[in-house]
Amino acid sequence: MSQIPETSDIVLIGAGIMSATLGTVLKELEPSLSVTMLETLHDCGQESSQAWNNAGTGHAANCELNYTPQRPDGSVDITKALEVNTEFDISRQLWAHLVTKGAIPDPRAFLHPCPHMSFVWGDDNVAFLRQRHREMAAHHCYHGMEFSEDSAQIAAWAPLIIEGRKPGQPIAATRIISGADVDYGALTHLLVKQLQAQSGFSVHYKHRVVALARGDDGRWLVTVENVASAERTTISARFVFAGAGGGALDILQKSGIPEGNGYAGFPVSGIWLRCDVDDISVRHHAKVYGKAAHGSPPMSVPHLDTRIIGGKRSLLFGPYAGFSSKFLKHGSYADLLRSIEPGNILPMLAVARDDWQLSEYLIGQVLQTSEHQFAALQGFFPRAQREDWQRAVAGQRVQIIKPDPQHTGVLEFGTELVASADNSFVALLGASPGASTAAFIAMEVLQKCFDDRLTPDGWLGALKQMIPTYGIDLKQDAAACRDSRARTAKVLQLDFV
C-alpha cells in the first residue's frame, strides 16, 4: 500500500459507491488533481455498497410505489418519481462514458437488464395502480410501461407471483422492461480500480479518520489512524468529501462546521430473505415491488427481486426493518449514543414525539416472528417453501434528523449534502435512493462546491462529454430523454423500448 501523502487536493472519506463516483468524476474533469481515498475497512464497497447489503435496484421510480402518492381526489402525484427517474439517467450516462472509453471493460460485470414491475392485490390497490399507470404512461419518461389485470398476462411476466394464488383475487401489475439489477459492490471495485490506474490517486484501507480541523491557511487537516498499528498521520487537503454512509454524521460532527449543528441520525437495520435455488431463481426475472401498509415509512415497501451477483442468479425478498444502534454494519452499538450532542438532542426528541408511526412500525417489525416474515413472502410468492430461503442481514441505513424551525426537528428519508460556508467540506447524509443516484449527487457536489470551475473555459466541456444531457431537463425534453436512453442502453447492454 502506498504511503499516505502529506497534502492532497481532494480527500474522500469512505470507499463506497459515493466516494468512488465523485472521485471518478473529478479525475475525469481534471486529471492533474491529487485525490486521496480513506477507508476504515480492508477493501472498498464493504458497507451499504456491498451487493447483498442493498437491493441492487437501479432506482428509476419505475416500480417503487412510495414515490407516487395518491392525492385525496384519487389522482396520483408523479413529481417525485420523475425526479428519481431522470436522476438515474445521470448514472447511466456516466457508466456509458466509462464503458466507451474502456475504463470499465464490460458493463455485465456489474449491470444486468431486469424488468421493473409493480404488483398489487385488492380492489382499492388495483384502482390505484390503474390510475398510476394512466398518469405515468402518458409521460415520455415512462414510455413503454405496460399494465395488466389479467392473471395469465402477469404470469407470463412473473410466473412465481401468480402460481398458487387464489382464483378471482383482484390483481394488477405494471411492467417496464428497461429496468436494471445493479451490483453496486462490483461497480465500486471497478471505479476504484480505474482510479488506481491514474497518477495522483491513492486509496488507503484500514485507516480511520480520527480528527478534522481547519489549518491557519484555510485547508483541512485530516488526521487518520492506522487501525492495525495505531500510527497517526495528518493530511492537508483543499477539499474534503465525507461519503462514508452511516459514518458521515460522525465526520460532519468532527468537522465542527456550524452548518452541521443540530443534525442527528436514526439508524434502521434490515433483513432479507434470500433464495439461491437455481430451479426457482431461473423462473423469476423481474424486480417486483408491492405497496407498503398504510402509514408505514418508505423503507417498508416489500419487493421480490432478481439478483445477479458474481454471475450467480438468486432471489431476494424484503426488507424487514429492525432497530440497531449501529450506524454501520461493521460499526459499534455505541454509534447512536456517541452521536448525541447538546445541539441535536432537541431535534431527536422532537422526532420521537412526532414520528410515532415510525416507532410503531419498527416495534412491530422487531417483534415479528419468522412465521410472520415468511407469510409476507407468500403474499408475493404463494408457493414459496421455507427450506428454500435463508435470512441475510442488509446494510445499515441512517435516516436524517435535522433541525426545523417549526417542529424543532424533522425526520427525512432522502439524502442531503451538508457543506461548510466556503464549500471546502461537504458530507452526504441519508440513505435513499442512494447508490442509484450517486452520479447525480456528484453533479450536486460540483455545483455546490466547484461552481467556479463549471465554465466554458473550465470543466464544462469535459462534463458535457461525460454527461451529454448536463443542463437539459429530461423531464421536459422528450427527444433528449429518448436519445440519451437509446444511446446508453446500447452501450450498457440494457433493454430499450
UniProtKB/Swiss-Prot annotation:
GO biological process annotation, one example: tricarboxylic acid cycle
Annotated SUPFAM superfamilies: FAD/NAD(P)-binding domain (SSF51905)
Cofactor(s) recorded in Swiss-Prot or TrEMBL: FAD
Superkingdom field: Bacteria
Entry keyword Flavoprotein: yes
Presence of keyword Nucleus: no
Alphabetic keyword roster: FAD, Flavoprotein, Oxidoreductase, Tricarboxylic acid cycle
Catalytic activity: (S)-malate + a quinone = a quinol + oxaloacetate
Protein name per its UniProtKB record: Probable malate:quinone oxidoreductase
Organism: Rhodopseudomonas palustris (strain ATCC BAA-98 / CGA009)
Gene: mqo
